[in-house]
Design a protein with these regions (language model features):
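Contiguous hydrophobic, core-forming segments of folded domains
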Residues: 72-155
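N-terminal secretory signal peptides that target proteins for export/translocation
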Residues: 1-4
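Sec/Tat signal peptide C-region and signal peptidase I cleavage site
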Residues: 19-25
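Acidic, serine/threonine-rich low-complexity disordered tracts
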Residues: 25-83, 92-94, 100-107, 163-250
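Solvent-exposed helix/loop surface patches that form functional interfaces
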Residues: 117-196, 203
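Bacterial N-terminal signal peptides
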Residues: 9-18
């Protein structure tokens, strides 16, 4: 389960910036979407994700603020797609604890590398590793461009393999994406295609994670509308939690 909890720290399509204060001070002109994270039974709003798109050439989030229901910011992330859309550079910080994640896309004459830095929520140790870049690698919010790149395969019902970066492992793990019934992505207000994310290979055999992750994309815009699974953010008691996130775009 520990691998599962850390795996989805890199999963959601969320981006943000580092700020020193714990409260919002944003340029609402660039507000692109708001994701409302509910408890799985929709009994409570747990937090909201304020997504900002500051690059007019991209239909992608470039930063996000994670806000409590009272509006206070408890975590933020910045994202840079300039070197790779599916393996972007990210900077993530959680103000409630010591958790942080950084990635850097490195290029030289021979091959590209990804530098990964990770610090756990309950540790003062910051760890780094260099990984060889592959086209199948997904880093954090690079999941959206990956889905769009393989859109026709996915909506046709084909299984698409990927290597998802797991910052806590300083490594990637193999996953498969495949289309599933839209009822798994309940909460969407528009027509969507629903996909399920599962572990691949030996990870599937040993039951690497128990609960599937469902992601729903709007059929025309190809934007994420629903996320149903374990959150990339722990609760205020540093415990993992499942969420149902619905997105509204502006």
């Amino acid at each position: 389960m520990n691998t599962l909890k850390s795996f989805f720290q890199c999963f959601l399509v969320i981006a943000g910036v580092f700020w020193q204060s714990g409260y919002a001070n944003t340029d609402e002109i660039n507000l692109w979407a708001i994701g409302t994270a509910w408890a799985p039974d929709k009994s409570d709003v747990l937090y909201r994700e304020y997504h900002f798109a500051e690059d007019p050439d991209l239909d992608l989030t470039t930063r996000v603020e994670y806000r409590r229901p009272d509006g206070s910011v408890f975590a933020e992330k910045a994202i840079d797609y300039s070197r790779s859309q599916t393996a972007p550079e990210i900077q993530h910080i959680d103000y409630r604890n010591t958790a942080r994640i950084n990635t850097e896309f490195l290029e030289d004459a021979r091959y590209a590398m990804i530098k990964v830095g990770f610090q756990a929520h309950d540790s003062n140790r910051y760890r780094e590793e260099l990984l060889t870049y592959r086209e199948s690698v997904i880093v954090d919010a690079g999941f959206d461009p990956f889905v769009r790149k393989h859109w026709e395969q996915l909506i046709a019902g084909e299984s698409v393999a990927a290597a998802m970066l797991v910052p806590s492992r300083l490594d990637t793990v193999e996953i498969n994406l495949i289309k599933t019934g839209s009822h798994h992505c309940n909460g969407a207000s528009v027509d969507i295609h629903c996909f399920v994310v599962r572990p691949a290979g030996i990870l599937r055999v040993v039951g690497w994670f128990v609960d599937p992750i469902y992601i729903g994309y709007e059929q025309v815009s190809r934007r994420l509308q629903v996320f149903n699974g374990i959150s990339n953010l722990r609760d205020d008691n540093d415990e993992p939690r499942n969420v149902l996130i619905s997105f509204e775009y502006f």
